[in-house]
UniProtKB/Swiss-Prot annotation:
Annotated keywords: Amino-acid transport, Cell inner membrane, Cell membrane, Membrane, Transmembrane, Transmembrane helix, Transport
GO biological process: cysteine export across plasma membrane
Protein name as annotated: Cysteine/O-acetylserine efflux protein
Organism field: Escherichia coli O1:K1 / APEC
Membrane side Periplasmic: residue ranges: 1-7, 68-69, 126-141, 195
Primary location group: membrane
Membrane topology: Multi-pass membrane protein
Highest taxon, organism lineage: Bacteria
Cytoplasmic-side positions: 29-46, 91-104, 163-176
Pfam families assigned to the protein according to its UniProt record, in alphabetical order: LysE
Underlying gene: eamB
Transmembrane feature ranges: 8-28, 47-67, 70-90, 105-125, 142-162, 177-194
Length: 195
């Protein structure tokens, strides 16, 4: 990879990993509501699911030049529906001030989110088809970069969770408002899938 292409790769992957999306918003919400330690299951589920999705993206990108538009469209609708459901769960979740103790979303729910998370699927397919496959078609490189993409995504999730933990007091004081803003951001993510 040339220095210019490498620079573009890092810019794309870091910006994509650090911008709001279903994973980052869920990580922030979970750490704000339950603390960083109790959110580790959520982060672990996201990380494992992210890695598997990146490896699947590698397989798809490696074997197909163009993804069937009908499959992408169906996946987009499924992803949008799940994201809107997640937004509803966050918007209606009780805050500490409500006096109810709730558990963070489960490992398996955060794991399952990855398979309908259009943002990370497009992230993986775009990074691989734009930056890797034009340079090399060595399977080891494609798989290696897929693992790197998952690590970069996990880094973004952890950063958002740490922000939720560090600003927990402030977020708890304005918990209801934060939940509504996060839910609206998720709805925005769902709408952006189509526009």
């Amino acid at each position: 990879m040339t220095p210019t292409l490498l620079s573009a790769f890092w810019t794309y992957t870091l910006i994509t990993a650090m911008t709001p999306g279903p994973n980052n918003i869920l990580a922030l919400s979970s750490a704000t509501s339950h603390g960083f330690r109790q959110s580790t299951r959520v982060l672990a589920g996201m990380s494992l699911g992210f890695l598997i999705v990146m490896l699947l993206c590698a397989g798809i990108s490696f074997s197909l030049a163009v993804i069937d538009p009908a499959a992408v469209h169906l996946l987009s609708w499924a992803g949008a529906a799940y994201i809107v459901w997640l937004a509803w769960k966050i918007a209606t979740s009780p805050t500490k001030e409500d006096g109810l103790q709730t558990k963070p979303i489960s490992f398996w729910a955060s794991f399952a989110l990855q398979f309908v998370n259009v943002k990370i699927i497009l992230y993986g397919v775009t990074a691989l088809s734009t930056f890797v496959l034009p340079q090399t078609q060595a399977l080891s490189w494609v798989v290696g970069v897929s693992v790197l993409l998952a690590m970069i995504g996990t880094f973004g999730n952890v950063c958002w969770a740490l922000a939720g933990h560090l600003f927990q007091r402030l977020f708890r004081q304005y918990g209801r408002q934060l939940n509504i803003v996060l839910a609206l951001l998720l709805v925005y993510c769902a709408v952006r899938i189509f526009y």
